From Swiss-Prot:
InterPro entries: Homeodomain-like_sf, PAIRED_DNA-bd_dom, Paired_dom, Pax2_C, PAX_fam, WH-like_DNA-bd_sf. This is Paired box protein Pax-2-B. Induction: By activin. Weakly by bFGF. GO terms for biological process: negative regulation of transcription by RNA polymerase II; nervous system development; positive regulation of transcription by RNA polymerase II; pronephros development; regulation of transcription by RNA polymerase II; segment polarity determination; sensory organ development. The keyword Phosphoprotein does not apply. Probable transcription factor. Involved in kidney development, acting synergistically with lhx1/lim-1 in pronephric morphogenesis during the tailbud stages. Its main location: nucleus. Residues 15-141 bind DNA.
Length: 494
């Protein structure tokens, strides 16, 4: 119908709220009039399409469709939600009861209030407010802020309010806050008393400028706030704590160190312990071979049997050795048999070491059998021996090599052959297979002494001077004479 559109659309826009796209007038937030709703339904019964109804009545398509849809579904043309809105639960009766409960028990929870409303029959399951609704009621309608009056009596806004409990802090009066305009009384415009004004003037006269004024006011406030709660001794202790710097000093002074800690870990307290260790080490002396290696020591002869009765003595005239302490290798069962001895003689300035005698097959070819039955030399813990010695050749090195095991030493050895007795020399006129000669100073072949075991030691110990293992000084042919080459080959095969 056009009756709601006959008026001036501009006046309707200013009066009702606006004009829609089709030129019809509508009012913001208000439903369509019942007359228009009835006309939409009548045109729909006549078979007019919704789009034509919208053009004729100048009502939007959405509005026509919504009204017709609700009419076809419910048979009603009344405006409103289909299911209806939830009834209001925050009735004055419920709000009064909630305020009553909070006044009786200020710490009561919202869910407890809800259960009590149901238990007392004030609300049923359909009308009881939710927990969030109860919290909102308490926040907005029950706990109203109090506005104190100049005479100190609180003025509450009309409605449901709670009496302030004794646990809540009282509102500070004008005389308790010397800060002035930044106080509650200053913000609320409450005039200060004469005593407050006089105290304010005294604080202002004590300060020397703006900074002094603010500092004095802060100090007076601090003293005033603490005067009723702490004793004088407590105040002094608090002042000392606040005057202490916030960050500790990196270099801590001696006064912060505990006296017992300083006496326990001081250098004079530690010195007697060091002296005891030194005296115990020196007192043990030669009793324990592994405890002290500073003094010279002598070691017994280790003897082993040869297949042939051969007596050979090697005497190195000069040696510079680093002291080492090999363990005793003498065996009572082998000490009586001494067919082959090598004596090592050094200067008086160096420790004296007894000879180490090795056993093996004839013709001077040393085997790799252990010296002591049931014990391999690789398991010994000799301080002078390297820990990575291969077990197959541990018991087959001559004395000169043992003397050269210590890295960084230069050993100068001169071999001299002493008169030797063997059955080959005494029973035959042929040259002796073992080069037994009655003269001294004879030396042997000059071939490089390149045994694989000694090459391994040369690489492992990294000798600064490898001449001990590879130079021809070990055996030379200058004084060998007319010895057969077969004999030399047989002797030098090790």
């Amino acid at each position: 119908m056009d009756m709601h559109c006959k008026a001036d659309p501009f006046s309707a826009m200013h009066r009702h709220g606006g004009v829609n796209q089709l030129g019809g007038v509508f009012v913001n937030g208000r439903p369509l009039p019942d007359v228009v709703r009835q006309r939409i339904v009548e045109l729909a019964h006549q078979g007019v399409r919704p789009c034509d109804i919208s053009r004729q009545l100048r009502v939007s398509h959405g509005c026509v469709s919504k009204i017709l849809g609700r009419y076809y579904e419910t048979g009603s043309i009344k405006p409103g939600v289909i299911g209806g809105s939830k009834p209001k639960v925050a009735t004055p009766k419920v709000v009064d009861k909630i305020a009553d409960y909070k006044r009786q028990n200020p710490t009561m929870f919202a869910w407890e209030i809800r259960d009590r409303l149901l238990a007392e029959g004030i609300c049923d399951n359909d009308t009881v407010p939710s927990v969030s609704s109860i919290n909102r009621i308490i926040r907005t309608k029950v706990q109203q802020p109090f506005h104190p009056t100049p005479d100190g009596t609180p003025v509450s806004t009309p409605g449901h309010t709670l009496v302030p409990s004794t646990a809540s802090p009282p509102v500070s009066s004008a005389s308790n806050d010397p800060v002035g305009s930044y106080s509650i009384n200053g913000i609320l415009g409450i005039p200060r008393s004469n005593g407050e004004k006089r105290k304010r003037d005294e604080d202002g006269s004590d300060g020397s400028g703006p900074n002094g004024d603010s500092q004095s006011s802060v100090e007076s406030l601090r003293k005033h706030l603490r005067a009723d709660n702490f004793t004088q001794q407590q105040l002094e202790a608090l002042d000392r704590v606040f005057e202490r710097p916030s960050y500790p000093d990196v270099f801590q002074s001696a006064e912060h160190i505990k006296s017992e800690q300083a006496s326990e870990y001081s250098l004079p307290a530690l010195t007697p312990g060091l002296d005891e260790v030194k005296s115990s080490l020196s007192a043990s002396g030669n009793a324990d071979l592994g405890s002290n290696v500073s003094g010279p020591q002598s070691y017994p002869v280790v003897t082993e049997s040869f297949a042939s009765h051969l007596y050979l003595k090697q005497e190195p005239h000069e040696a510079s050795l680093t002291p080492f302490t090999p363990s005793s290798l003498a065996s009572s069962g082998l000490a009586d048999i001494q067919p082959f001895q090598m004596a090592l003689t050094v200067d008086a300035s160096t420790p004296t070491y007894s000879s180490f005698t090795h056993h093996g097959p004839p013709y001077g070819q040393f085997g790799s059998q252990p010296l002591i039955a049931g014990r391999d030399m690789s398991s010994t813990t000799l301080p002078g021996y390297p820990p990575h010695v291969p077990p197959t050749g541990q018991g087959s090195y001559p004395t000169s090599t043992l003397a050269g095991m210590v890295p960084g030493t230069n050993v100068s050895v001169h071999h001299s052959v002493q008169p030797v007795e063997c059955c080959s020399c005494l029973s035959s006129s042929k040259p002796c297979l073992f080069h037994c000669r009655t003269g001294s100073g004879s030396e042997f072949s000059g071939n490089p002494y390149s045994h694989p075991q000694y090459t391994t030691y040369n690489e492992a110990w990294r000798f600064s001077n490898p001449a001990l293992l590879s130079s021809p000084y070990y055996y030379s042919a200058t004084s060998r004479g007319s010895a057969p080459p077969t004999a030399a080959t047989a002797y030098d095969r090790h």
